[in-house]
Amino acid sequence: MLAKRIIPCLDVREGRVVKGINFEDLRDAGSILEQARFYNNELADELVFLDISASLESRKTTLEEVLKVSEEVFIPLTVGGGISSVERARDAFLHGADKVSVNTAAVYDPKLITRIADQYGSQAVVVAIDVKKVGEKYIVHTHSGKELTKYEALEWARMVQELGAGEILLTSMDRDGTKAGYDNEILREISTSVHIPVIASGGAGNLEHLYDGFAKGCADAALAASIFHFRQYTIREAKEYLRERGIEVRL
């Protein structure tokens, strides 16, 4: 069995790490480089850098910051936000990204996933799926959660797999920043319906939530921000807790 991964996420806006609740009410969470260095030394398996306003503002990811982070960390770095073309993906790779995360642009141009995967390999393409419950259905949203799409979450997850995605980053907008735990219902539904890895995101508030994401949600990796940014827990503490409960992790 592959080891489960713990992945801190740097949501970046205007040169700082920020964290919000339900994609709103952002508060400062520190220096980008300080947080990146901390996680590099803290047994993080990977690091995600998301320029959270790039797609909303129709601009490129802040590549200068990406380059600085890539020079400081020696774990896989995923970069997202404003990756709307193969050229922008290439720029991210040239600035040190190991993977790119596509979200809004892929919904409006699904073949973008294929074009990037054909050039750089599926292993380098993460499709971020932001979902929110609308009635009884989980609906995909874009533009940092501002716009509702025609896709149901499972339908879109299966599509991106066929288009060449190597991984799915599944975020529950309803749970984001609430510390109420991952939405293990949709997480499990998607994780057990696709054969590519699924990263749980949105809602981690304690170590049991991480465990539940793996044990109940069947996730391959758990992404978290608040609990690590504000030093509620260290990644080592999280991994030791998971190992004690029978989850295989790298320590």
UniProtKB/Swiss-Prot annotation:
Pathway named in the protein's UniProt entry: Amino-acid biosynthesis; L-histidine biosynthesis; L-histidine from 5-phospho-alpha-D-ribose 1-diphosphate: step 5/9
Catalytic residues as annotated in Swiss-Prot or TrEMBL: 11, 130
SUPFAM superfamilies in alphabetical order: Ribulose-phoshate binding barrel
Subcellular locations according to the entry: Cytoplasm
One GO molecular-function entry: lyase activity
EC numbers for this chain: 4.3.2.10
Assembly information from the UniProt record: Heterodimer of HisH and HisF.
Function summary: IGPS catalyzes the conversion of PRFAR and glutamine to IGP, AICAR and glutamate. The HisF subunit catalyzes the cyclization activity that produces IGP and AICAR from PRFAR using the ammonia provided by the HisH subunit.
Family: Belongs to the HisA/HisF family.
The name this protein goes by in its record: Imidazole glycerol phosphate synthase subunit HisF
Gene name, Swiss-Prot/TrEMBL: hisF
